[in-house]
């Protein structure tokens, strides 16, 4: 009873802190405000510690690592977003991941808190298929890979949005240049100033897209490595539990598709002609594939991984 109460308190405290963090991120996204950035970072540290405490509490209470159903896996996924945020800030204080990880954490935590049936919050005895030491290795690697791949895909989507808007700006400028024949001196002067301003904005957008492409590549590369480890450990576990390394059930099939899309993305990044926007399109497709892989089997409730099926409120 004490552990259940503590878990309930930690869940709502984490959600409240993440709400404050995302609010400060939105306030400082367009304009740097002294003090709020530090408050946001301290908030993410607090979120990470409290979600860690929540997982440890549930682990002690249930006697196993909390990765047995959708509720527990979503908590771990939220923890994964927070972990990526912490690591990225340690390596490089200024990057774009914080604008992705904080909203991802709050949406995940919000769905955990209010989107699932209360019965799913209760810890249950592991089904025989999950009573293995491979649970920690396989499921944790898969969920951490999902967190990394989702963050990298969102960065690529942001890159596509900026690139698309940049191309629209160029088209609008060309229309303006060819729409007027002779322009008087004052209009020419104003046009030069506008073109100079446009060039500066264009250079800034170029730098921004390069940074987004760089971080997307790094994060997806990490996610691909974790996904590979998760699939390999799952194959070994499947051989022990079911006598076969691979069975092509829905979860395994979509995991393989996710791995393939990630591999294609990494391959396109090695070709200079396919970098940036072209590779970002592949990563954006991967964003949808990852969610199908994660939720698809739970919605269908079929296959060897169907023990995690769920119902919404």
Swiss-Prot record:
Its main location: plastid. One of its GO terms (cellular component) is chloroplast thylakoid membrane. It is found in: Plastid, Chloroplast thylakoid membrane. GO terms for biological process: cytochrome complex assembly. The keyword Protein transport does not apply. GO terms for molecular function: heme binding. It is a multi-pass membrane protein. Keywords: Chloroplast, Cytochrome c-type biogenesis, Membrane, Plastid, Thylakoid, Transmembrane, Transmembrane helix. The chain crosses the membrane at residues 13-35, 43-63, 67-87, 96-116, 142-162, 219-239, 252-269, 280-300. Belongs to the CcmF/CycK/Ccl1/NrfE/CcsA family. May interact with Ccs1. Required during biogenesis of c-type cytochromes (cytochrome c6 and cytochrome f) at the step of heme attachment. This is Cytochrome c biogenesis protein CcsA. It comes from Amborella trichopoda. The lineage of its organism: Eukaryota, Viridiplantae, Streptophyta, Embryophyta, Tracheophyta. The gene is ccsA.
